[in-house]
Amino acid sequence: MNYTTQMDAAKKGIITKEMQVVAEKEGINIETLMNLMAEGKIVIPANKNHKSISAEGVGQGLKTKINVNLGISKDCANIELELEKVKKAIDMNAESIMDLSNYGKTYDFRKRLVEVSTAMIGTVPMYDVVGFYDKELKDITVDEFFDVVEKHAKDGVDFVTIHAGLNRETIETFRRNKRLTNIVSRGGSLLFAWMELNNRENPFYEYFDRLLDICEKYDLTLSLGDACRPGSIADATDAVQIKELITLGELTKRAWERNVQVIIEGPGHMAMNEIEANVLLEKKLCHGAPFYVLGPIVTDIAPGYDHITSAIGGAMAASYGADFLCYVTPAEHLRLPNLEDVREGIVATKIAAHAADIAKGISGARDIDNKMSDARKRLDWDEMFSLAIDSEKAIRYRKESTPEHKDSCTMCGKMCSIRNMNKILEGKDINLLRED
């Protein structure tokens, strides 16, 4: 190959096979795609060692993508169940899967995930350091942090979340500005603890070029994590969050100089009226890099329903320009999600992403809605089911409450507006009280 990374290829005017796949999926001119990749406004996460991937693009002018989180924990270490979730995510056309395993030797699951997943794969290496070395957090060395990142890269993951923006300056801002929920990022809180226990700078910030060496070697996309994302609507858009975002913008430019692709991670918990400003801030401060939002969750009072609170925030964020939505399941804040939670989270997030694509004017986004509306006008139930984002549920609901007349449902029966308009416009009687 005459290039090191997808970004390097784009800058050199080299069309990669991954670019060809993305251009075809998106219906975008490949030269336009390549130019936006060269500017860092679109990324194609595709590790050189992930052979089963069907490449996806994330960024400006492309369809909004969704990510599914899964992985083993100490309390739920069933690898086979997590692989069932992987299959469910792929079957439901999720573009990304993040393995957030944080217990034991995570290699076995990660290896199998890379073998079977056509979706791009992300990880948070910070979760793995304690289990990998079987050492307490405070005893982990700088070399060991980077060795784990390289291990994940070598295994074939396409992007890694690294909380490089949590430096000593950001921590000082955190200390000066009281928060209701402190630091809620799991990786961020672990890094904060390591820095405090060792009185050291964040190694991923201090030795950022070493991180870029790994990313360049494997064409590993860098997802710059927001350690200080708000964990409550009270903490949204505060000085700590913005301080870290400014740092992430500076690191983005350094990564681009090395042809390393970058995604910026964002909030978090946030009231609806703050979402548009946050998307604008990310795009300005991080120079148009793709924005990956974790929700946003728009109210803090809905445990058990946070797939809904996040779908509201995600639809808004993506409509304003966010590019990548992390799903949230009904189990958020309560437990590890089961298979049904995963399904519900995917459906809610896909609805949010699609609704945003319509609002953004993504080419062809409305086509399936128009097909659905036409099928409804014709009362073609089979076609409606085939077009539904969750066909299984639509079919089940229809079967659970069967109408007397096939050209209606049990909500309206013969008073169905579509049925009656069709008949009247065809010059027929609607016969509400007697048989047709």
Swiss-Prot record:
Entry superkingdom: Bacteria
Pathway(s) annotated for this protein in UniProt: Cofactor biosynthesis; thiamine diphosphate biosynthesis
Record: residues binding substrate: 69, 98, 127, 163, 185-187, 226-229, 265, 292
Binding site for [4Fe-4S] cluster: 409, 412, 416
UniProt GO molecular function: 4 iron, 4 sulfur cluster binding; carbon-carbon lyase activity; zinc ion binding
Catalyzed chemical reaction(s): 5-amino-1-(5-phospho-beta-D-ribosyl)imidazole + S-adenosyl-L-methionine = 4-amino-2-methyl-5-(phosphooxymethyl)pyrimidine + CO + 5'-deoxyadenosine + formate + L-methionine + 3 H(+)
GO BP: thiamine biosynthetic process; thiamine diphosphate biosynthetic process
Entry EC number(s): 4.1.99.17
Sorted UniProt keywords: 4Fe-4S, Iron, Iron-sulfur, Lyase, Metal-binding, S-adenosyl-L-methionine, Thiamine biosynthesis, Zinc
Residues annotated as binding Zn(2+): 269, 333
Enzyme class: lyase
A cellular-component GO term for this protein: cytosol
InterPro entries (alphabetical): ThiC, ThiC/Bza_core_dom, ThiC/BzaA/B
Cofactor: [4Fe-4S] cluster
Cofactor descriptive note: Binds 1 [4Fe-4S] cluster per subunit. The cluster is coordinated with 3 cysteines and an exchangeable S-adenosyl-L-methionine.
Function summary: Catalyzes the synthesis of the hydroxymethylpyrimidine phosphate (HMP-P) moiety of thiamine from aminoimidazole ribotide (AIR) in a radical S-adenosyl-L-methionine (SAM)-dependent reaction.
Sequence similarity: Belongs to the ThiC family.
PANTHER family recorded: PHOSPHOMETHYLPYRIMIDINE SYNTHASE, CHLOROPLASTIC, THIAMINE BIOSYNTHESIS PROTEIN THIC
Descriptive protein name: Phosphomethylpyrimidine synthase
